[in-house]
């Protein structure tokens, strides 16, 4: 009997201990992840100090704008940092007030770009450009004819020596400051790549070309044939040049359409993608 009572007491004590001992909390603990700022794909760690310095000096700009401008080397004055362009033959090559071509560079595939004089273009018949442009330019020219007007090249490829003559003439006639607004220094001209063209429409010469009744249509068609307007209006601080309604640049259809869709200048697009 005593043994039975003792056994019951032990069972009760054990039960009490189990009952009063805290149960382990098995509820899953959910961790709240902080939302992270999307990474900027064109951020370069080696430029961090330059980004920080430029951001402090331009606090009104977004981080994305600062990174773009520093990638464009706009934290230096124009011609304040010279980078040798190592890939002058690529369609996406850039030549501007920072990127410079070797003084001996000359495309190996130059061809005459104006196939005939046309109604207004007798003085434009001997300009050359790279062969890679030819087919798309002729297709664009035919599209213009179908629309009722004629397209001509008024200036195509220029050697570095030729560009030097033009630039020096501008400096002597006006000033270095004025020359730099509208004319590239030797080695910095897109014309030397053989991919940049100055154009005219009908009797509207290059400086009057945007007054042509079909100019807006012409601009809207450029990317379909691989061209972009290289120096758009109100973008002088980005491109380094005054607005040039007549200067088009060949980059190929795919890239031209991407640049147009982005709404960026070629300089900005290049800084974000190459």
Residue ranges of model-derived segments:
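Extracytoplasmic cell-surface/polysaccharide-interacting catalytic and binding patches
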Residues: 6, 14-155, 160-274
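Positively charged n-region of N-terminal signal peptides that target proteins for export
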Residues: 1-4
